[in-house]
């Protein structure tokens, strides 16, 4: 007879002993709600509320005329503390993680940053969250979901994804004070961002002539698409968007229609972090990352360059080496030809040379614009045809299928329903593929990390374990042969 004993689950509660924390102010959920309520009430009495006045200034204005009442001690603790910890949070303030596994923490506290980083909007935001009129303004999804039988596996997968924090991100915009979230607009530039003027001033506390920043697109913060960019200062102080140089999207990693981009400024004066970012993240020093060029033209730029191909060739003729490389790939589609030119020029000359060439090419097209007329709108020709020919985007088949869609009548129930089913199925299968591909990529990386070349052999983990001769490597792994020919000649 075999019996299985229940094993207690492992739980982590990260603050092990609150008493050991120095200079943190602890409040229970109820205490904090009361303090917030009275603070907001008092701040509303302020005669001159002003976004640019710090919270402390506003409080001095108010409490110069009235007493802080019963919450005075609490406010002193908040101002004194290095951070404020609110404990015993109910799930309608701070949603739990949807999918629990053995590593899920049972955190029910929220750590707020130092008071100096708060502003009036932040206090209003906290008050709305903690003192919401409807007790259940946020539904505890994890509880509710577990009571619903979801027959469709994939949809359940997506709802219960272990990355699914329901509300947490709304805190992050306030708490991660080194980062600034903004909507993205495009700029025909190289490796540069132009953040809102106040975000630069607020971070550095003064005018800075030459700052640098990490930039990341928000939905899935991946390491590969993180770039180090130069920060250009915006002339207008009323512009709250971030303008991103088109070159800094490797390949098609970022579509920038209204995306969020996160900018984290690097510390000044130039520190070791700054140096490391230069070495690994800046196209001037490492133009090629894995198999991608760090700088890539987006489709609109490719289209404009294709339109001005004579000007491009005139520019390249002033650089014999670049022009020779350009002629090697004469029979390749224009968009791929640009990529190959930048890659080869980097390998033969230097990363900085490719960076500067990229910069020159963007200068050529800075005044271009695209105008669509009836020909494009009704005939799907004109600029569309040029766009396809340049290899920038789309294909003849895509235009044909668009025409076919336009011809579909509302009464063709069969066609419409088949398309709807197909699109749902492809959505679901692509979701599955993402999971499978992710696992494959991870596995390949784990294997490849242990491979290296020594004495013309490919070795795995140690020198004695030789897998094959270096001759077995496909040419993609080696220095491009047509460039070796250039050196030999």
UniProtKB/Swiss-Prot annotation:
The lineage of its organism: Viruses, Viruses incertae sedis, Naldaviricetes, Lefavirales, Baculoviridae. One of its GO terms (biological process) is viral transcription. This is Late expression factor 9. The keyword DNA-binding does not apply. Involved in late/very late gene activation. The keyword Phosphoprotein does not apply. Pfam families: LEF-9. Keywords: Transcription, Transcription regulation. Belongs to the baculoviridae LEF-9 family.
């Amino acid at each position: 007879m075999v019996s299985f004993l229940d094993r207690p689950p492992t739980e982590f509660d990260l603050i092990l002993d609150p008493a050991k924390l120095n200079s943190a102010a602890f409040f229970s959920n109820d205490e904090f709600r009361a303090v917030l309520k009275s603070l907001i009430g008092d701040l509303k009495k302020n005669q001159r509320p002003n976004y640019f006045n710090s919270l402390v200034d506003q409080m001095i204005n108010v409490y110069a005329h009235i007493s802080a009442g019963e919450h005075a001690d609490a406010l002193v603790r908040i101002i004194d503390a290095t951070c404020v910890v609110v404990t015993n949070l109910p799930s309608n303030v701070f949603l739990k993680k949807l999918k629990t596994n053995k590593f899920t923490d049972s955190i029910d506290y929220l750590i707020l940053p130092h008071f100096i980083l708060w502003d009036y909007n932040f206090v209003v935001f906290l008050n709305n969250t903690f003192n919401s009129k409807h007790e259940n303004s946020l539904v505890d999804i994890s509880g509710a979901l577990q009571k619903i039988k979801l027959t469709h596996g994939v949809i359940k997968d997506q709802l219960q994804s272990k990355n699914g924090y329901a509300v947490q991100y709304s805190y992050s915009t306030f708490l991660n004070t080194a980062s600034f979230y903004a909507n993205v607009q495009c700029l025909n530039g190289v490796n540069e961002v132009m953040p809102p003027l106040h975000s630069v001033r607020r971070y550095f506390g003064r005018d800075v002539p030459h700052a640098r920043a990490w930039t990341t697109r928000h939905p899935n913060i991946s390491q590969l698409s993180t770039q180090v960019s130069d920060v250009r200062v915006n002339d207008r102080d009323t512009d709250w968007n971030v303008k991103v140089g088109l070159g800094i999207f490797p390949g098609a990693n970022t579509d920038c229609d209204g995306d969020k981009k996160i900018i984290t400024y690097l510390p000044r004066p130039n520190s070791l972090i700054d140096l490391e970012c230069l070495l690994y993240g800046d196209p001037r020093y490492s133009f090629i990352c894995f198999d991608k060029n760090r700088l890539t033209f987006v489709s609109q730029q490719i289209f404009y360059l294709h339109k001005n191909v004579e000007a491009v060739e005139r520019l390249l003729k002033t650089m014999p080496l670049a022009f020779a490389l350009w002629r090697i790939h004469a029979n390749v589609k224009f968009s791929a030809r640009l990529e190959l030119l930048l890659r080869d020029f980097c390998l033969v000359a230097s990363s900085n040379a490719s960076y500067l060439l990229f910069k020159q090419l963007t200068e050529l097209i800075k005044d271009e614009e695209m105008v669509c007329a009836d020909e494009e709108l009704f005939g799907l020709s004109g600029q569309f045809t040029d766009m396809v020919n340049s290899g920038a985007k789309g294909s003849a088949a895509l235009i044909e299928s668009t025409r076919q869609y336009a011809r579909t009548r509302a009464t063709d129930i069969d066609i419409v329903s088949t398309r709807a089913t197909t699109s749902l199925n492809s959505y679901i299968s692509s979701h599955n593929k993402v999971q499978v591909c992710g696992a494959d990529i991870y596995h390949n990386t784990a294997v490849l990390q242990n491979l290296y070349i020594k004495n013309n052999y490919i070795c795995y983990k140690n020198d004695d374990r030789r897998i094959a001769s270096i001759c077995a490597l496909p040419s993609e792994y080696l220095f491009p042969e047509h460039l070796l020919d250039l050196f030999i000649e």
